[in-house]
Amino acid sequence: MKDDHLIMAVHVTDRLTKASQVQALLTEYGCNIKTRLGLHETGPDACSPNGILILELVNGAEACNELLQKLNAIDGIEAKLVTFSH
């Protein structure tokens, strides 16, 4: 049986003030992040203060759940974990 496929979605409000806290956690759990995709609205005259991160996680659910709890402890951050079993 293959390992579960773990995907985390992280909604970041006020990216300018929250990005450093989020980045510190992503660095701390860097060995558990296989893929990272950042999305936010941008244009010639504006850049959205909000954003979404999509993370593909590896190396088991325990560390992923720790990351989830730490991200959700930051005011203005909402993280959700989706587990796909094979």
Language model regions located:
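Long, contiguous binding/interaction regions
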Residues: 1-86
